[in-house]
Amino acid sequence: MDNNTNNKHAAGGPPMTFAMPMYHDFVPKWIRPWIYVVLAFCFQLSNGMYLGAMNNIVGEWGIMREDVQMCLYATLIGMALYFPVLFRMKFRFSNKLLLMMSAAVIVVCNILATFRMPLPLLWALCVVCGMAKIQGTFECMSTIQLWMTPKRDFGVFFPILHIILLCSIEVAGYLAAWFAFDMHWTYMHWLVMALMLVVLLVQALLTRPFHAMPQIIPLKGIDWMGALLWCVLWLQVAWLLNYGDWLDWWHSSDFRLVMGTMLITLAVCLQRMMHHPKPYIEPAMWTYHNVVPVILLIGVVEALFSCEHVLEMVYYEEVMHYADHTYEALNQWSLPGIVAGCLFSIGWLKLMRWNVYKLIALALVAFCIYAGGFYVLVDSNISIEQLRIPILWRGFSYAVLCISFMWCLHAIMSFEHFFQALSVFNVLHMFVGGLVGAALHGRGMKYYVADGFARCSGYVDSVRLSARAVDFPQMMNGIVEGFLAQSVKILFGWTLIAGLFFAALMLLWDIPMVRHQVKHIPAWPVVGMRVLRGVQRQRRLKRIRQLRRQRQ
């Protein structure tokens, strides 16, 4: 992506007039967009099941951790699956109806999710909940987009959007763990239901039906059968990667059976994509320049970030013996990093308009600081406060990478295929990349723990336990904790090396083989003056827009 492309997409279009005609006249204009920000945050707090209360759900229902995790992946699949039809829904139904229906569906799903039901039915329920969640969030954020950026500048919109998305994920995890610790895990479901009732009340009392298009566009031409096939395929992929380690991969007949059916489903999906007149995901989406490398890089980065859910959890639960509430409270230190990463992305993409590939490289360097911090700190005798700085860097890195990848897709694709690409992007971004990385990290944990026992067993055999009183169970518990901490440290080291490799790769991505002219890097005072001029330019544009509104 060259600088001209960056400038073209960063500049946006001419300023547009922002209005929210769906509100009744008695609602003050200044508060209208803020109400939708709160509603978007409420939608993002919702889920089918909440992983912050995973251990409590596992203990009460007598199921496995993988079963609860599969509920999360089903919710994410529902969100990813729904992207290609978001605008079709917006152009067919009114804003009020879409928000009220999304809130009502989430209420029903959260009520039913508190009952013990067959797992396939629970997963289907989570898929529907994910669809309602993304529909409500999209309707809120697309309505106030012009309020956030009058030129529809995605260098501003994507960072602000991710402040809401990523912060709500962390807050939801903490609330679920807090309710499970102090009360009962179902209280999180009741809180979400109460928030959805607030959404319904706001829409019923403050708004009226309003269509985004003067003429209603019907839903004809949508490949619903293709959407169902892709949903089944992604559920099969999630099941294989989620349960593969527990089933011992190819040694299980169930794993081989689901793998065979997954390959058949994949073949049917590809055949329909190539021959259907209007497939749900069009083959033309894959023909854009650099789209395949970007999507593959998304999967690789998510695989690296899986250390948060595998290595950190092993360290917290098995070595440090932290409860879920303690871990989620510690995880809130990623919030300052998330906000800082989003604001930094605005400065990079909007004010300075620098190359996005360098921004990805910088985010990977921040990830390396996080991985290196854990590599240095992992031990059974550290203070919990020492882990705050690496977690902050993790939040910064993840926020910048999410924004950068969405910016890349927006820059290289037309609007016609952008939301189809977002669907594939979110499949890799939300669960496939993370599950592949989790499988690799889990395999590494098994190898290094077994290797540690093999190396130590000879020394244990030579110890004369009868020579003095020894609490053998306590001694073995300390040895196991030491091996687990050592394995986590080793795998963080390998993750650090991989992060440095991909950071260097991104720095070299768009460097030509032969440089005909050398561009000198300006001194820091010059860079500071450019940043200051960018801020002043934005202030002048803001004053001009305010004057235009006053004249109107």
List the predicted regions and their residue ranges.
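Central cavity-lining transmembrane alpha-helices of secondary-active solute carriers
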Residues: 70-88, 134-141, 332-345
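Cytosolic juxtamembrane N-terminal segment immediately preceding the first transmembrane helix
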Residues: 1-46, 59
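Hydrophobic transmembrane-helix bundles of small-molecule transporters
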Residues: 181-296
